[in-house]
Structures are given as C-alpha cells and as structure tokens.
Curated annotation (Swiss-Prot):
PROSITE patterns xref list: RIBOSOMAL_S7 (PS00052)
Function: One of the primary rRNA binding proteins, it binds directly to 16S rRNA where it nucleates assembly of the head domain of the 30S subunit. Is located at the subunit interface close to the decoding center, probably blocks exit of the E-site tRNA.
One GO BP: translation
Family: Belongs to the universal ribosomal protein uS7 family.
Entry-linked InterPro entries: Ribosomal_uS7, Ribosomal_uS7_bac/org-type, Ribosomal_uS7_CS, Ribosomal_uS7_dom, Ribosomal_uS7_dom_sf
Sorted UniProt keywords: Ribonucleoprotein, Ribosomal protein, RNA-binding, rRNA-binding, tRNA-binding
Protein name, entry field: Small ribosomal subunit protein uS7
A Pfam entry, by short name: Ribosomal_S7
SUPFAM superfamilies per the UniProt record, alphabetical: Ribosomal protein S7
Top-rank taxon: Bacteria
Subunit relationships: Part of the 30S ribosomal subunit. Contacts proteins S9 and S11.
Species this protein is from: Buchnera aphidicola subsp. Baizongia pistaciae (strain Bp)
CDD domains xrefs: uS7_Bacteria
Length: 156
C-alpha cells in the first residue's frame, strides 16, 4: 500500500445546541463509556451556569477560557548522539485547542466539588481569571520550553 498522501482529519459534527465544533469536541472529551447524552448535559449546564455568572454568551465564555489555557510552545524529546534533549517547538493551532480542552477537563476531574457540572464550571471560571490548575499546566509547559531554549536549533 502506498503511503504518499497524509491522512485527512476526521470531520467532527457540530453539537445540536450551539452548532459549534469546539463544544462538540469538549463533549467528546468529557464523555465516559460512550455516554454522550450525559456528557452533553454536563457541558451545556456548566456553560449555562458560567454564562449567567459572568453575563456573557456561552460560546464566548468557553472561547475566553480556552484562550487563557492554550499553549504556544511545548517541548519534544529529540535524541542526538546518545543523549536526549527536550527541544522546544511551536504548537500547531489544532493541537493548541485539543491540549487546552484536555487540560481543562483533566483539571475539572481532579477537583473536589459535588458534581462534574460544578467542577467544569469552576475550572472554566478559573481559566477565564487566569488561575487554576489548567492555566498552571500551560505555565509549566511554557517554563519548560523557555528553560530548554538553548536546544531550539535541534528542531526538525
């Protein structure tokens, strides 16, 4: 089989409520054991709760939170002559979105609030205010890239 062409990305259908691909991806990340309707309920209620609290539309609130968590650079291991270097590379836009959503959901799951709706809402709220563990994760990744700036010439 020839391997000339790269694989095209699978198109994700937008969600029913907001017709947004971004919300659909968040729902898919939240989903556990294929229970999409529960994941949709969690995301929609968390966004509605946060939108009421802040006083802005749901999609705008989500975009604000993601903007503050998106990484611009990350490090990748590169083996050169027997030793491994952490080489800083720029993150592609699609991966930025994916990482930001993954970090927010992971941080929300680690919280100790009553329900996932409240945990997700609080984590998004913290992300908007530039605090919380998802923002801390982005800062750690940026700090790591900054510390390894000397190895940037090993980029490929």
């Amino acid at each position: 089989m020839p391997r000339r062409r790269g694989i095209g990305h699978r198109k994700i259908l937008s969600d029913p409520k907001f017709s947004s691909e971004m919300v659909a991806k968040l729902i898919n990340i939240i989903m556990v054991d294929g229970k999409k309707s529960i994941a949709e309920e969690i995301v929609y209620q968390a966004l509605t709760m946060l939108a009421k609290k802040i006083g802005k539309p749901e999609l705008e609130v989500l975009e604000l939170a993601l903007e503050n968590v998106r990484p611009t650079v990350e490090v990748k291991s590169r083996r050169v002559g027997g030793s491994t270097y952490q080489v800083p590379i720029e993150v592609r836009p699609v991966r930025r979105h994916a990482l930001a959503m993954r970090w927010i959901v992971h941080s929300a799951r680690k919280r100790i609030d009553k329900s996932m709706i409240i945990r997700l809402s609080n984590e998004l709220s913290d992300a908007i205010e530039n605090k919380g563990s998802a923002v801390k994760k982005r800062e750690d990744v940026h700090r790591m890239a900054e510390a390894n700036k000397a190895f940037a010439h090993y980029r490929w």
